[in-house]
Amino acid sequence: MSWQTYVDEHLMCDVGDGQGHHLTAAAIVGHDGSVWAQSANFPQFKGQEFSDIMKDFDEPGHLAPTGLFMAGAKYMVIQGEPGAVIRGKKGAGGITIKKTGQSCVFGIYEEPVTPGQCNMVVERLGDYLLEQGL
């Protein structure tokens, strides 16, 4: 299965609410910042944004004072799982990032998708990739 198939079928899928809702954007990005696969509207990283995200996995709390930035958009960092999951909130939407052995799985959502639905979709794929040694 290609990385793009993982994004298209496992991240941009129906979130399971029975109403056909799905994430706004998603991607799988290597630890070096290279994009393995992404949805058509996934925002592009600017400057130090990706390295700051990776630093927060190594030093949990790094992003809390300044916020998490994606393509210049600021997300308030909310409770995640230190070293494993970063979650952010921006208005009626947010972001979930799950770190795996070789990559980071990104999911961005807007209402009516809920934070819990985004977390479930992103973390389910992230956990699967971890089980596969990826």
UniProtKB/Swiss-Prot annotation:
Cellular component, GO annotation: cytoplasm; cytoskeleton; nucleus
PROSITE patterns the record matches: PROFILIN
Entry keyword set: Actin-binding, Cytoplasm, Cytoskeleton
CDD domains cross-referenced by the UniProt entry: PROF
Principal localisation: cytoplasm
Taxonomy, superkingdom: Eukaryota
Disruption phenotype: In germinating pollen grain, the double mutant prf4 and prf5 reduces the amount of F-actin and induces disorganization of actin filaments within the apical and subapical regions of the pollen tube.
Keyword Cytoplasm attached: yes
Subcellular compartments: Cytoplasm, Cytoskeleton; Cytoplasm
Keyword field contains Iron: no
GO molecular function, one term: actin binding
Tissue specificity note: Specifically expressed in mature and germinating pollen grains, and growing pollen tubes (at protein level).
Alphabetical list of Gene3D superfamilies matching this protein: Dynein light chain 2a, cytoplasmic
Quaternary context: Occurs in many kinds of cells as a complex with monomeric actin in a 1:1 ratio.
Similarity annotation: Belongs to the profilin family.
Function description: Binds to actin monomers and regulates the organization of the actin cytoskeleton. At high concentrations, profilin prevents the polymerization of actin, whereas it enhances it at low concentrations. At low concentrations, associates with the poly-proline motif of formins to enhance actin filament elongation rate. Acts redundantly with PRF5 to regulate apical actin polymerization at the tip of pollen tube and control polarized pollen tube growth. Functions probably by favoring formin-mediated actin polymerization at pollen tube tips.
Protein name, per record: Profilin-4
Species, as recorded: Arabidopsis thaliana (Mouse-ear cress)
Lineage: Eukaryota, Viridiplantae, Streptophyta, Embryophyta, Tracheophyta
